[in-house]
Amino acid sequence: RALYYQLNINFRLMKYMILSDIHGSLPALQKALDIYRGTGCQMLCLLGDILNYGPRNGLPEGLDPKGVASLLNAMASDIVAVRGNCDSEVDQMLLQFPIMQDSLLIVDNGVRLWLTHGHVYNSGRKPAASADVLFYGHTHLWELYADADGTIVCNTGSPTFPKGGNKPTLAIYDNGRVTIMTTDGEVLATKDL
């Protein structure tokens, strides 16, 4: 069941960082938050797999779920999040913002941004309601394209366990533009509405 979360912004557009698959790595989160602050983002959208590294992955560099929780809790009022396949009620107990919804919708100045992890909804199985941009993660492989119905589809990749030979990545949404960048600040792709 989707949570519909609407931000009413009255002509003031927000800048969002969209981040998925941290998997408990404190150094990976710190690098991403350096980009968050450096680019002037105002809201952090977490697409799940926040604290737990998952049994299929090796141990991430700097595994520190409590440190990740502490860093995120300090900015809880600026975070919206959805549940990943590695997130549980135990993880929720450590975090001071909700993470247990499978998806949520942000409406920013009329633009519909769907956030989901990717294990329930993704580019092949979209949520029932339409969106201008669909953000997801889960596969750790970034992608950015416009599909046949004009929806921008963005897999943010992962700052911790990038796959396919990719660098650690995240996404930024700002005033109709989606950008994929590395945690070192290199822009890999952009797409405009």
Regions found by a protein language model. Give the residues of each.
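Conserved beta-sheet core of the metallophosphoesterase superfamily
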Residues: 101, 109-114, 119-190
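N-terminal amphipathic/basic-hydrophobic helices that include classical n-h-c signal peptides
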Residues: 1-13
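Intrinsic structural disorder/low-complexity segments
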Residues: 7-10, 26, 88, 120, ...
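Intrinsically disordered, low-complexity N-terminal regions enriched in serine/proline/glycine
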Residues: 3-4, 35, 172
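Core catalytic region of metal-dependent phosphoesterases/phosphodiesterases
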Residues: 15-108
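Intrinsic low-complexity/disordered segments
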Residues: 1-3, 20, 114, 135
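Anion-binding (especially nucleotide phosphate/pyrophosphate-binding) glycine-rich loop
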Residues: 193
